[in-house]
Amino acid sequence: MDRARIARLLPETYQAAVAPHNPLGAVLAVMESLQAPAEAALASLDAHVDPLRAPPDFALMLARWLDLDRYLDWTGGRPGEGTPRYAAGLGRLRLLSLEAAELARWRGTRRTLERILTVATGLSGYAVQENPPGPKGASTSFHLRVVAPAAAQPLADLVRRIVDEERPAYTTYDIEFSAA
């Protein structure tokens, strides 16, 4: 808000006394400068809640709001200690945040598990097999086999955490990386 608009909020007696080089004018100038940062933040508020345009620190905060912090690595070794980092990069985390609501809607399904792995790592070719045959050929009930592309090997810890969090709670799983 500029000085003139602030002055219009004052009683008429004070409005008449406003001049550029008197104490009241100086107070209005200070008030104007104090409001500038808040007004700039409000003017770009929409960018802060858009995962694709949010500043990096705010993108991490959005991820935490969307319960995606379980996929962050912390430099201190434990959640909340040190600086958060996402193994597949901030760009991937932004895309995951963008799709978080839709993914949460279908959480616990094969389709969603494949989709979240694809979005989270930026790699395609994930396959989830439900009740796959065991070592003796009989199907294994309540078990998932996640087949990940070979290129996901450097992100194996992230893939494991995602499968562990997003699979149905009553299932067991194993992860295989396809041959290169």
Specify the residue positions occupied by each region the protein language model found.
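Intrinsic low-complexity, intrinsically disordered or marginally ordered coil/linker segments
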Residues: 1-180
